[in-house]
Amino acid sequence: MHSPGFQYRLYYPRYISGYEKVKMYTTNQTNTMETGPHTKGIVIFGATGDLCKKKLIPALHKLWEKDLLPENFVITGSARRDPGVTVWKESLGEYPDEFMNHLDYISTDLDSVESLRHLPDYLEDNTYFLSVPPERYENAIVNLKEAGKLEDPERSRVVIEKPFGYDYKSAHHLQSVVERYLREKQVYRIDHYLGKDTVNNILATRFSNILLEPLWNRTYIEEVQIFATETIGCDGRAQYYETAGAVRDMLQNHILQVLALVAMEAPCKMSAREIRREKTKVLAATRLGEDMIFGQYQGYRDEEGVDPNSRTPTSVAGTLFVDNWRWEGVPFRVLTGKKMPYGCVEVVIKLKAPPLKLYDGEINDRIVIRLQPNPHLDIRMDIKSPGLDDNLELATLTHDYPQDRAVDGYEKLLYDAINCDQSHFVHADEVMESWRIVDDLLCTGEKCKIRTVPYIYIGGGWGPQHKVDRITDWDYPA
């Protein structure tokens, strides 16, 4: 035991500030007083992979440029392979030396408790980012806990990439592991759509404007259409896509999260707890319709890593219903897929026609929220054309969302995780309700409740269009 007033040195590695830094601690009879600031850090597992190089490090660099990272913030890359810190840094690309001085690398194995004990212990607040295959999540959480890295729920957290589970059963199992070793406040489940400014703007548009809220219900809305389409195919990801398909890749997460934001009730305050509670309530009231259509683009089965007899859907179209007071009877149409004519994420709110038709050529009013690309908000309505007759023409009020101030999804999500804000992360209950909704679509046997055998479609169309067009009169994006 040191005597009162004894001073000892704690060495910080040079990459915190570019040189070896010493912090002095002074003891007294009752406590240990630290004279320097707390140090935060993020440990990225899977740091030799593409996600780290292409998304995470660029996002952290942008936060650093904006002076939004703590002064002594440390970014530690980690993976089983050990290229060495110099080679790893060089593999990331060109960044200023001042930023690179915050980076370090240590080789660890998520399957080994002893290996994880070698992670830095000089950091007092840690965010652990699991940029690893989903099948490694369970061992990672268990072993990080056993290694003593997650003991303080106020100063340690785990960021988990999608997918959280493969179906309802596997998600339930993974959640049981999470509950056993972590508190929910320590778990940050990423859906990168929730980091997009334009997606977050859905709530701002709805709840900060009295103009729209009185119309936002079954009395005035005929249907809602949600598009998440791509012009590309699997683009080298066929092996992954073969195990995921359009349901797991898009519908279970991104599309249902957008639906929840469009359909949820106003939270009593803009906190993580209240926002996620309202989203969960909407998802709990959501069910599939009976007109779900699967498609698979022609040539998919010829791609490397794909079963020649694959039934994996590359497109899904159909209807969901939200069985609550606000939305009873209003169909939510969804369309997602690859190799389609136009790539975008868009929400179309189609309003009902007036009770009495006084003019010829009336078109239902629409509110269109384009999330990407070229994000904007449109309000489309009929007005009288200039002239002597009573012809109508479409008028569009458009607000283009300014992109010069927009932030990348991972930039927003990393900033929130580091600062312990779960507002834009997915709660366990949301995950389980989402899997419940789509679970019937994952059936591959002969006794499936819904036909899950995909119709083959030629790239450049809206999936198997002869089937898709029977669902509704789509407002296809352009």
Where on the chain are the PLM-derived regions?
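N-terminal amphipathic/basic-hydrophobic helices that include classical n-h-c signal peptides
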Residues: 1-30
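Secretory/organelle targeting and membrane-embedding segments
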Residues: 25-159, 164-478
